[in-house]
Amino acid sequence: MVEVRVWAPQAQVVEVQVADGERLALQRSADSADGEWLGAVPDGVRYQLLVDGGPGLVDPVATQVWFADDHRRTAPNAWAEAVRWPQPQSSRWTSRPLVVGEAHAHGLTRTRERPDAGKLSAIIDELPRLSSIGVSVLELLPIHQFDPAENNYWGYMPLVFGAVHQLYGTADDLAEVVAAAHELDMEIWVDVVVNHTTEEDEHGPTFNLRGLADADYYAHDADGGYINDAGCGNIIDATSAPAQRLVMAGLDRLADLGIDGFRFDLAAVLARDPEFVRSIGDWAAGRRVRLIAEPWDLARYLLGRDFPDRRWSQWNGKFRDDMRGFLRGEGGLVPAVMRRVQGSPDLFDEPLRSINFLTAHDGFTMYDLVAYDRKHNDANGWGGTDGTDDNRSWNCGWEGEVGVPAEVEVLRRRQLRNAMTLLLLSHGTPMFVVGDEFGRTQGGNNNPYNQDNATTWTDWARRDDFASLEAFVSGVVAVRAAHPVLTQAEPWGRDVEWFGANGPPDLAPHSRSIAWHVGGLYVMANMWWEGIDFTVQVPGAWRVAIDTGFDTTSENGLVDRSVAAEPVGTSISVGPRSIIVLTAP
């Protein structure tokens, strides 16, 4: 038998309806004030919950969900399946520096020629390549159950927090992915959406929480309406004990699969109860899992020290914005770039808590960042009104890929190398989207949340054309791994030295270049559209390890040539929109 435990404090009668028509009454908890109803169902059966004879509801802590053929968004017909969860396995943190690759569990393998393309099981064969280029963490977009009738590809409208989306596979499949990653000294993180649900507002469908205990699970305003700080119709009431228990039940269950880290979508919603956020931190310490916050929602921006628990890592949106601006040649950003390169000390006491990224699932891909000046979202069905207009991108002089001149494509490849260099040689924890390393594109769509098609599926054919870029990324990750200063827990402080082209750093509004020296690295970054001669201002037997400024699409930017810098004063020409990295032998 499988236990059924339901929170429905206002109910007079709660029953389980089994698929064969049998009804089983649940019993109110011995503490009648508790609001909990208890019972059990046979292993393997499909069942729904009935509250006071109302329509069938999905158990919010179901282990698996099944949808009838006549299921529709406007007339839900979904059933819990009493399937036992796999035997618990432990997390296993990587021994390597963290380099995070974000991917969609379905889209990553959808175009592979194999029977299980688009399934969790297919991910296992992608892990060796990722490991070989230095990715030590695969972060999967939401894998929990959502409504397949909703036209939502990303999965950010959850139905059951602790069940695996049935179109991707089973909990056993996910456990096998985790085990395979651990064998390669890799971690698996999953993106969890526990701040809102697929039930939307009062006009949305009722699947479970609204029919069980609406007032306890959702946050409401003074007029009784749903607070919509997630932009999806509702938010979980993070101050409510039943809602907190539901969140923790889902996390506990996924942690039992050996998941190594959880990235919390719109974590500022949970921070409405700071003590709850800290209790999640305590739980994570006991389970040995990492916590990563998207530290904002529509109402609050809690990046850095404003977030209520310093043990959480955070997506650093300021790194994204400042570095994108610098990359495209905006003036006046040198002071901001200096902060981002050294782990954002204005925001974080511990640099590795900063998840540095230029791209994520929402927004442009890395290639689209250098190929489009504006979003191209018409296919999403909102007349181009969805998605941000603040992309901070530059198309290198030509919009899109159709008919692109050769010299523009050369510049784009250089900009891609620049982007990866800035990302991977900054202090903090770098993240990029899997496919960025070989020029993945979404055709300029920066919000393809409902595009379950070639727009979002990984196009593996591009690997051949962008082989040099993939080799470059692997090489820069190797440079990163060889310089512990980039992955140390302590801030750089006074260990980093900053320079301009021929003296102290140029912090003027027109400046577009900066150099720095730390831990055996000397980096010269020129985002101006003309070349600049940099004077090497630290003596040593330097070698050029990286030069992004090649004028072909086949060069990978990895070089190895000596530079005489004894005494100080050697001049190195850094080309237009280029970066040169020196390493000490």
Residue spans for each PLM region:
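Substrate-binding/active-site clefts of carbohydrate-active enzymes
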Residues: 104-258, 267-284, 290, 332, ...
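Carbohydrate-binding surface patches
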Residues: 1-5, 9-12, 498-537
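Conserved alpha/beta catalytic core and glycan-binding cleft of carbohydrate-active enzymes
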Residues: 66, 70-74, 78, 272, ...
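The feature marks proteins involved in alpha-glucan
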Residues: 1, 23-102, 107-115, 122
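Hydrophobic faces of well-ordered beta-strands that scaffold small-molecule active sites
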Residues: 99-101, 138, 188-190, 262, ...
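Glycan-recognition and catalytic regions of carbohydrate-active enzymes
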Residues: 409, 416-444, 463-521
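C-terminal beta-strand-rich structural cap/linker in extracellular carbohydrate-active enzymes
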Residues: 44-46, 562-585
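C-terminal accessory region downstream of the catalytic core in glycan-modifying enzymes
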Residues: 476-477, 530-563
